[in-house]
Amino acid sequence: MRHYEIVFMVHPDQSEQVPAMIERYTASVKEAGGQVHRLEDWGRRQLAYPINKLHKAHYVLMNVEAPQSVIDELETNFRYNDAVLRNLIVHTKAAVTEASPMVKAKESKVAEAVAEVESEEAGE
């Protein structure tokens, strides 16, 4: 089995359906004997340029190890699902399990905010 990185963008009005979509896609990978090495829900983000007159989309990143048949099935699901605006499936050499730069940046911002609040409380 090969390793893949999958990113898909969902219509912002369909954000409540994202957990069900993630569950469905991960279940299809696991049923075929594959593994999900990393799953990140990046949430609603600003697009670099409008797509179908939309300026925001809900982003999801998955790193999976799966047979080609599952990847073909996912591509078909993405293509015929109107809620999925764009998708990208890239073959990788090895499993990626570390946090993405998007998540690391978010965690560092949270850590800075916590440190700032703690320093303000200590100063009072």
Swiss-Prot record:
Binds together with bS18 to 16S ribosomal RNA. Pfam families: Ribosomal_S6. Belongs to the bacterial ribosomal protein bS6 family. GO terms for biological process: translation. GO terms for molecular function: small ribosomal subunit rRNA binding; structural constituent of ribosome. It comes from Actinobacillus pleuropneumoniae serotype 3 (strain JL03). It comes from the Bacteria. This is Small ribosomal subunit protein bS6. Keywords: Ribonucleoprotein, Ribosomal protein, RNA-binding, rRNA-binding.
